[in-house]
């Protein structure tokens, strides 16, 4: 059995020779789920739908879960026990240039125009109206 040296902290990956727990997270979930805390859940949801084609609807009693490709991003209201906190996320999309243009049209500020990176990504960076930073990338072979 795997035992964490820290109290109440589970292991997210098996160690060599250790037992692997198969039910430590719900089926279909990734190990890491980003969570953005904002004072404007509905506005951020609209932005994600417009720019990234994200799926999901604002929720009031639970975090809003937005699907983006094969990933989920949780969005929570920052007016309760948690203060609004921006995030920095790297998102792969079909076309970085078009997604960048949609972000700018939706009110985002350009930080970096689409640029070919030496590691094979075409990448752009924007800052949305809630101070989240989005690096938008499309992989192109080197």
Predicted features along the sequence, with ranges:
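Short beta->alpha transition motifs characteristic of CBS
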Residues: 35, 77-78, 118, 125, ...
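Vicinal oxygen chelate
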Residues: 31-39, 64-67, 80-104, 122-127
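Conserved active-site tyrosine of GNAT-family acetyltransferases
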Residues: 47-48, 103, 128-131
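N-terminal beta-strand motif that seeds the catalytic metal site of vicinal oxygen chelate
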Residues: 6-46, 55, 70-72, 87-89, ...
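Conserved acetyl-CoA-binding loop of GNAT-fold acetyltransferases
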Residues: 50-57, 107-109
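Conserved short beta-strand elements that form part of the metal-binding/catalytic scaffold
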Residues: 55-87, 133-138
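Active-site region of chymotrypsin-like
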Residues: 88, 106, 110-114
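Short, small/polar residue-rich loop motifs at catalytic or cofactor-binding pockets
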Residues: 60, 119-121
